């Protein structure tokens, strides 16, 4: 057979990443060990022939005199060979696995480098299946590793063995060997044809799996949106359709795999028939003796067995080839090594601090949208050491400026220069070292808060000992400047608190403050702030802007903003519109001309009532004093007393840094105030009930029981197992008929061999048994593969169904990362297929063969059988020890793989932030540390696997040697005839082979065992992790006409509400809160950070349960509402807009149950002021959205339009204007002012303009409503609302 054809695909072979220079020692050991191991079967054949040659001597002499000693020596030679093969085979397999691991790590490093260094930003923009391909590529790495390790080891050992066996067979009789192997061309033909079909369908299955991974990852990342829009069924339906395609392609692949196996078994078993005829004739003619014939037959039998064993490995090699093709496509697709340094002329540092920054006639279109000009002949000049503002509508091209400045995109017209030097001639690393960009959509990583803050620093600071005074002061200054100090003091572990999954989830405002702290530590000459404080409340926003002005005095600072009040009179600004600069000048100059667009926008945003002119002088003075005393100690009532109130000042023995760095176990638990600008973002300290290593592994018996209980086609499973039983039974039957053929060529005492009639009869029987064997092996392989695939498909769908029913708190669990669950469901579950298709089959065959074979052997020759049976406890004990060791190794290995892939997932999903912060080295270091840990575990696994396989082989050869010795001895003492000996011997040999094939399944079983345990962990988790549905719940919607009468009744009523998050049960968000909301209200929910504004949305939509007190909607307790019916009545627009990579139409109609007219979509788009953007897009509503390139304002307005199209009775806007420009904000403000098409509109906001648009205000503080009324009244009362709006702190 052409083995190499199975290890190549196109130009990429699976050993592409073997480095001969570095691996030559390992390769030498591997080659020597492989050759030596491959020679073992041939040597065994020779030794076996020598053993049975004593039989012909005994028959010829009629006496056993002098034969015992030779029998002992020749039998023990087989045993000695088995013992000698242990270290050789162990070294060989271990070295092969090490080669595979080295290849795997090199490929992972190449993938890391490709993601971090080589892929341009346009590649990320164009890749719609980024996360799906990410999941798939991780599986490909593992398949390639497996194919170049265990599979290649076995294949090449078998290849050596085949060559050696052929050589041995040819040596003893070339003519007999050629006769036996005359059917090999047919075998090769079928193998090649079927392998090509397997390759085709494997590729198709991988492609569909990638789509499924993309969908699953998105649905987990957008879990809140999926629940609010009641699209769980839609997501499950889409997932089910993709998984069904995976199922179809895999089953077609299985058909060809099973057909190949069945035909190969039939042909290899039947190729001996012609050999027996020829061998018998040669013996009769005296041209061959029995030793020659037995040696040839044994060699060819082992050759056929070797080919059968290689078949499964060839399939693995094919998958490895497909995997390599996929990996190389990823590495080569769009990759440009150092793409932005092609014309580097100046790699010396410029004096950025005194350099002007200039955009000259710059025009640009994103590569993914070449027909849409984002910038049109833009010319800008940013003076060194000055503050410059850029304002403009959402989508006007403001954010694109920073992308071009940092050279994330190339191919623009015009020039960008620093101090006259074109940035194309400046090393990109130098640019990023001297320019910091803080994005509106800032990113935090799943790490400690300290590491997140230091991520913006130089490598020396980031990795330095944080106990040094210099770094302590650096952290302290950054936290104080970014207004983080009080928040950090309230965290459970201070700066060492884990952020993200498994730890604390920060709100949008807190994330932005961490991003500002990063920028402070970097302190680069040029700072680019892109809506960097938009998510903050008024108090923190204004304080932070003043702090930024103090910090950046004399440094080049460019601020992109929609908040025009941040611009001072002498600040220079540019106003952009539709990619062009339409106005420029200082604020005072532009305001002096009432015809300017800026003047119109400014007055539009600042068109307040006379109450706004009421300014508390004392408040202003405090604000000024705050900035002036920034470097010493913050003195505002909000922050200045933070340290002193807690007993920390400069004279304390416990410094501020120590207070926030260490967990304050001596401080009594108190309420943690958390900003809640985003729905569902609250402080949630995860309390894991499981260790980080995951759930306890289920036993094989438990998994099989659950499989049998849940498998879809039980009849097919039974039929498959029945075919497996019959296929298993054909082995001893074949052995039995085969023994008669052997008997036919052994000369009797009169020197005669079997007659032609005798050989013809048993030859036909052998052919019949071989045909039955091939048919039933095909049937059991195909049927069980189908059953296993349907089981896996059903498990995937069950998991998806469970994921869409999980409550929101579940997604913050440490073991519930989207990337990890996606890999588990789409990748690791493949390993579970082998439990049905291979383990159950092997177990059934083993039980059948053992039962039938051993009973038959006992009947045929009980003495020899009992000797063999006495060896079985050795196999059982060893299998148990080997299985236990390998199970731990496999579990640890998979866990380490998951950790490595989670690190890579963070890189892929946050690549722009990493590049902006020059954090590549940090992530490379983190990745390297995880890789070292994984290498250590992989090494242990390689040693354990090599040990297990080599010891199994030794045990088999030892048992074989004992059977040889005792069987021939029984013949020599006339207790057995040669026929009885051959019959018993072949039956026992096939039984042992079946047993060892079961042991060889242990690595696959261990992998499948882990996958099943983790999957059933998700399926079996406690009921409190699911959203609970009340069977008798209300399904009737809110009837609007019932609120038009004279009697005024609340549409929402909150009564004695007390609530704390399950993860922080002692930190009460609400304490006995009461208030009502009425039809026709546009109710503004106002409060400082941490007062529970967004938590109210979570309770109204029942994303969290209300257990103390009541929330009634339309007179019905939310706990008595049907979840879907309730959420259909409420539309929520989140602060962070969430869209998916699809058309504008698909995003607008997401979650809608009824058909909607196109004109209604356009009306909604006009309503929110984004109609022009949509109609100017290439395909209008059918234009595909690139979520990474839409501006925050554009995405937010699409989300508002989507919410309006739902026509819900209650509309909730959660900081929905934070990303909008003044014109767009005014449009939304006007909508709110006039009253959106809803019975009740709730507006959570920090914007004064939005507050004034509401006809009613509710102010929250300390878990209660402290003020109710309209804005003007509450403002003039100088109460809590006045303090929030005017920056006065209580």
UniProtKB/Swiss-Prot annotation:
Binding residues annotated for ATP 2, in chain numbering: 1087-1094
Localization per record: Membrane
Record: glycosylation sites: 61
Enzyme class: translocase
Intervals, Cytoplasmic compartment: 1-25, 97-150, 195-262, 318-715, 785-838, 887-945, 1003-1290
Topology of this chain in the membrane: Multi-pass membrane protein
Pfam families in the cross-refs: ABC_membrane, ABC_tran
Binding residues for ATP 1: 392-399
Effect of residue 509 to D: 0.5% mating activity
Reported impact of residue 1087 to V: 0.3% mating activity
Extracellular side: 47-75, 172-173, 284-296, 737-763, 860-865, 967-981
Main location: membrane
Domain ABC transporter: start-end pairs: 357-603, 1052-1287
Assigned EC number: 7.4.2.7
Mitochondrion in keyword set: no
The keyword Ubl conjugation is assigned to this record: yes
Record-level Gene Ontology MF annotations: ABC-type oligopeptide transporter activity; ABC-type peptide transporter activity; ATP binding; ATP hydrolysis activity
Catalytically driven reaction(s): an [alpha-factor](in) + ATP + H2O = an [alpha-factor](out) + ADP + phosphate + H(+)
Stated consequence of mutating residue 1193 to D: 6% mating activity
Post-translational modification: Degraded via the ubiquitin system.
Function comment: STE6 is required in yeast MATA cells for production of A-factor pheromone. STE6 is involved in the transport of the farnesyl-derivation of the A-factor pheromone.
PANTHER family: ALPHA-FACTOR-TRANSPORTING ATPASE (PTHR43394:SF15), ATP-DEPENDENT PERMEASE MDL1, MITOCHONDRIAL (PTHR43394)
Family according to the record: Belongs to the ABC transporter superfamily. Alpha-factor sex pheromone exporter (TC 3.A.1.206) family.
Annotated protein name in UniProt: Alpha-factor-transporting ATPase
């Amino acid at each position: 057979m052409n083995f190499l054809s199975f290890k190549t695909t196109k130009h990429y072979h699976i050993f592409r990443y073997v480095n001969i220079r570095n691996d030559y020692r390992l390769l030498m050991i591997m080659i020597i060990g492989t050759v030596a191991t491959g020679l073992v079967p041939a040597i065994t054949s020779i030794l076996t022939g020598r053993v049975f040659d004593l039989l012909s001597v005994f028959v010829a002499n009629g006496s056993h005199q002098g034969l015992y000693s030779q029998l002992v020596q020749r039998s023990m030679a087989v045993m000695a060979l088995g013992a000698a093969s242990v270290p050789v085979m162990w070294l060989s397999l271990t070295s092969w696995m090490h080669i595979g691991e080295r290849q795997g790590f090199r490929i992972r490093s190449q993938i890391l480098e490709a993601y971090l260094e080589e892929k341009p930003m346009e590649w990320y923009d164009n890749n719609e299946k980024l996360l799906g391909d990410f999941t798939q590529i991780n599986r490909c790495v593992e398949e390639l590793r497996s194919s170049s390790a265990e599979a290649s080891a076995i294949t090449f050992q078998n290849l050596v063995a085949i060559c050696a066996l052929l050589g041995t067979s040819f040596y003893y009789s070339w003519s007999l060997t050629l006769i036996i192997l005359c059917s090999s061309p047919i075998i090769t033909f079928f193998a090649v044809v079927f392998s090509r079909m397997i390759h085709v369908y494997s590729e198709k299955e991988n492609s569909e799996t990638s789509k499924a991974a993309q969908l699953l990852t998105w649905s987990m990342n957008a879990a809140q949106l999926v629940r609010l829009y009641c699209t769980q069924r839609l997501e499950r339906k889409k997932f089910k359709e993709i998984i069904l395609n995976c199922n179809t392609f895999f089953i077609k692949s299985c058909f060809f795999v099973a057909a190949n196996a069945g035909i190969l078994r039939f042909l290899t078993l039947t190729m001996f028939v012609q050999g027996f005829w020829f061998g018998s004739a040669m013996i009769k003619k005296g041209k061959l003796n029995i030793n020659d014939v037995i040696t040839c037959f044994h060699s060819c039998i082992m050759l056929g067995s070797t080919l059968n064993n290689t078949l499964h490995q060839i399939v693995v090699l094919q998958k490895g080839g497909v995997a390599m093709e996929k990996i190389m496509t990823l590495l080569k697709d769009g990759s440009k090594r150092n793409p932005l340094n092609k014309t580097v002329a100046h790699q010396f540092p410029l004096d950025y601090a005194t350099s002007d920054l200039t955009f000259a006639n710059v025009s640009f279109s994103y590569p993914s949208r070449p027909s849409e000009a984002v910038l049109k002949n833009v010319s800008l000049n940013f003076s060194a050491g000055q503050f410059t503002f850029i304002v403009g509508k959402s989508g006007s091209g403001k954010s694109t400026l920073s992308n071009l400045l940092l050279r994330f995109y190339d191919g623009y017209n015009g020039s960008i220069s620093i101090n006259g030097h074109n940035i194309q001639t400046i090393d990109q690393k130098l640019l990023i070292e001297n320019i910091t960009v803080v994005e509106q959509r800032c990113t935090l990583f799943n790490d400690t808060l300290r590491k997140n803050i230091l991520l913006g620093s130089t490598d020396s600071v980031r990795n330095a000992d944080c106990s040094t005074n210099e770094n302590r002061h650096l952290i302290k200054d950054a936290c104080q400047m970014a207004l983080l100090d009080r928040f950090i003091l309230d965290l459970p572990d201070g700066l060492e608190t884990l952020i993200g999954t498994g730890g604390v989830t920060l709100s949008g405002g807190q994330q932005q403050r961490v991003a500002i702290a990063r920028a402070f530590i970097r302190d680069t000459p040029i700072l680019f702030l892109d809506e960097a404080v938009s998510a903050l409340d008024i108090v923190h926003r204004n304080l932070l802007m003043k702090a930024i002005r103090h910090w950046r005095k004399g440094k080049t600072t460019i601020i992109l903003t929609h908040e025009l009040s941040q611009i001072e009179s002498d600040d220079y600004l540019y106003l952009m519109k539709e990619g062009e600069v339409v106005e420029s000048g200082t604020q005072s100059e532009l305001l002096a001309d009432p015809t300017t667009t800026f003047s119109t926008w400014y007055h539009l945003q600042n068109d307040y009532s006379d109450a706004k002119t009421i300014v508390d002088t004392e408040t202003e003075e405090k604000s000024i004093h705050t900035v002036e005393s920034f470097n010493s100690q913050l003195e505002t009532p909000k922050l200045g007393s933070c340290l002193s109130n807690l007993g920390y000042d400069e004279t304390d023995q416990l410094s501020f840094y120590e207070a926030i760095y260490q967990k304050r176990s001596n401080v009594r638990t108190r309420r943690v105030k958390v900003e809640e600008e985003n729905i569902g973002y609250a402080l949630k300290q995860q309390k894991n009930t499981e260790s980080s290593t995951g759930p306890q592994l289920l036993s094989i018996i438990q998994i099989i029981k659950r499989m049998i209980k849940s498998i879809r086609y039980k009849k097919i499973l039974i039929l498959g197992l029945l075919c497996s039983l019959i296929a298993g039974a054909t082995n001893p039957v074949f052995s039995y008929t085969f023994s008669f053929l052997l008997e036919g060529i052994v000369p009797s005492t009169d020197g005669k061999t079997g007659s032609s009639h005798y050989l013809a009869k048993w030859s036909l029987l052998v052919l019949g048994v071989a045909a039955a064997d091939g048919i039933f092996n095909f049937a059991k392989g195909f049927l069980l593969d189908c059953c296993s695939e349907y089981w896996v498909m059903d498990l995937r769908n069950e998991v998806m169904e469970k994921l869409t029913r999980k409550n929101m708190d579940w997604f913050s669990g440490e073991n519930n990362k989207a990337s990890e669950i996606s890999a588990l469901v789409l990748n690791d579950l493949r390993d579970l297929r082998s439990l049905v298709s291979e383990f159950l089959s092997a177990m059934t065959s083993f039980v059948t063969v053992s039962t039938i074979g051993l009973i038959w052997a006992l009947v045929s020759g009980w003495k020899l059988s009992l000797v063999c049976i006495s060896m079985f406890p050795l196999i059982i004990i060893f299998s148990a020890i080997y299985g236990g060791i390998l199970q731990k190794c496999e579990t640890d290995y998979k866990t380490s793989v998951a950790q490595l892939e989670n690190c890579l997932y963070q890189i892929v999903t946050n690549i722009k932030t990493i590049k902006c912060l020059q954090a590549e080295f940090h992530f490379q270091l983190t990745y390297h540390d995880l890789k070292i840990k994984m290498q250590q575990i992989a090494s242990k696994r390689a040693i354990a696997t090599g040990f297990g396989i080599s010891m199994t082989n030794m045990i088999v050869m030892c048992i074989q040697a004992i059977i040889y010795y005792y069987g021939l001895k029984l013949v020599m003492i006339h207790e057995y005839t040669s026929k009885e000996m051959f019959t018993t011997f072949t039956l026992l040999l096939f039984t042992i082979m079946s047993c060892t094939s079961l042991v060889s399944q242990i690595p696959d079983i261990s992998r499948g065992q882990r996958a099943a345990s983790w999957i059933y962990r998700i399926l079996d988790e406690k009921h409190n992790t699911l959203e609970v549905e009340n069977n008798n719940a209300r399904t009737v919607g809110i009837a609007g006409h019932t609120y038009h009468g004279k009697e005024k009744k609340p549409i929402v009523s909150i009564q004695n509400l007390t609530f704390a998050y399950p993860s922080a049960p002692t930190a009460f968000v609400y304490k006995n809160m009461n208030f009502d909301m009425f039809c026709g209200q546009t109710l503004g929910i106002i409060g400082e950070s941490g007062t529970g504004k967004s938590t109210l949305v979570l309770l109204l939509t029942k994303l969290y349960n209300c257990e103390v007190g009541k929330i009634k909607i339309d007179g019905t307790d939310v706990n008595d509402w049907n979840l879907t019916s309730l959420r259909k009545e409420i539309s929520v627009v989140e602060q962070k807009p969430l869209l998916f990579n699809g058309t504008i139409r698909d995003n607008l109609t997401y979650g809608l149950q009824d058909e909607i007219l196109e004109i209604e979509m356009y009306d909604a788009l006009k309503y929110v002021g984004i109609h022009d953007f949509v109609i100017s897009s290439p395909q209008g509503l059918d234009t595909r959205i690139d979520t990474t390139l839409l501006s925050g304002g554009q995405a937010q307005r699409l989300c508002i339009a989507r919410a309006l199209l739902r026509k819900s009775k209650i509309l909730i806007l959660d900081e929905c204007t934070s990303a909008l420009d003044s014109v767009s904000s005014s449009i939304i403000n006007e909508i709110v002012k006039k009253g959106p098409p809803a019975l009740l509109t709730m507006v959570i906001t920090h914007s004064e303009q939005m507050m004034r648009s509401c006809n009613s205000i509710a102010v929250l503080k300390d878990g209660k409503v402290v003020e109710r009324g309209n804005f003007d009244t509450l403002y003039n009362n100088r109460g809590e609302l006045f303090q929030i709006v005017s920056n006065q702190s209580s």
